[in-house]
Amino acid sequence: LTGHLDDRQIAEFARHQPIVVTGRRLDAPQVRALALDQEAGGYLATRHLLSLGHRRIAHIAGPADHTDATERRAGYERALREAGLPLARELVVQSDFMESGGLLAMNRLLDSGQSFTAVFAANDQSAFGARMAMYRRGVRVPDDVSIVGVDDLPGAAYATPPMTTVRQPIYESALAAAHALVT
């Protein structure tokens, strides 16, 4: 799991030790990269909201320099295009992948005065923060605004009400990474 190391740093480390990275695409000697289809996660989350009848779907985006975030946003935009809906840039708020960032992003959306009936958060942690912001403002989930995250963190099932999330095969990815290390 690479965190915020850039590709150059990973390739340099791999010169001394074969490594496996998950969650990114990287072509370098002695590096095995295992990537998930993040675009599909954003697409599925947005399609779900569209299937519920939502047409004004906000997006709490992840960091602009993070591949997972940009790919999930691309999936959000593709789902809107396929539904014949314009991308409402005023409904896209940049954030990080943290609860506090989701809370701040939702506050910006609510303060903007823009109407929306649903939110696609780039990950579950951002969605948790967004839910807290809505709760503090008296906005009821899902009665007033629906929200979908990505990752299927264990806490999603224990939120009130349980949060809809797109499952990422994290366990399976970790098994594949471990297997790649020993083969």
Identify the role of each PLM range:
Residues 59-78, 128:
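Secondary-structure junction motif
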Residues 77-100:
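Short beta-strand elements in bilobed, periplasmic/extracellular small-molecule ligand-binding domains
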